[in-house]
């Protein structure tokens, strides 16, 4: 989701971060905390509960290399979008991306000027 997905789907623009939408599930939360610690982002506030509440944004780093982990995005349900995801290779790395219809729907529901501009260019 976010600027990288927008670019993948054909509207090339700058972005200051990588937005990753994560499922709100206990096993997923445990794996995320472990992975983040392995990457060296361990802070006292890091715990599984951060990933078990919808509407959370966990930010790591500073633009332009910031990573944002989102537990919810506007107008979309994770399981439904995950079922319609696109599997792609980016720099020889397999990634799952939100489908174009789901991305446009999300952008319209988010409603910020930047999101509406993305939706207009992607439609």
Located regions from the model:
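Compositionally biased terminal segments of proteins
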Residues: 1-123
């Amino acid at each position: 989701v976010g600027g990288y997905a927008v670019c993948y789907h054909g509207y090339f623009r700058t972005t200051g971060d990588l937005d990753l939408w994560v499922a709100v599930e206990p096993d997923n939360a445990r794996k995320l905390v472990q992975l983040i610690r392995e990457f060296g982002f361990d802070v006292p506030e890091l715990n599984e509960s951060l990933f078990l509440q919808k509407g959370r944004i966990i930010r790591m780093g500073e633009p332009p290399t910031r990573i944002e982990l989102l537990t919810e995005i506007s107008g979309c349900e994770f399981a439904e979008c995950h079922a319609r995801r696109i599997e792609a290779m980016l720099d020889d790395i397999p990634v799952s991306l939100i489908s174009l219809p789901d991305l446009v729907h999300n952008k319209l529901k988010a409603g910020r000027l930047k999101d509406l501009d993305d939706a207009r260019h992607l439609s």
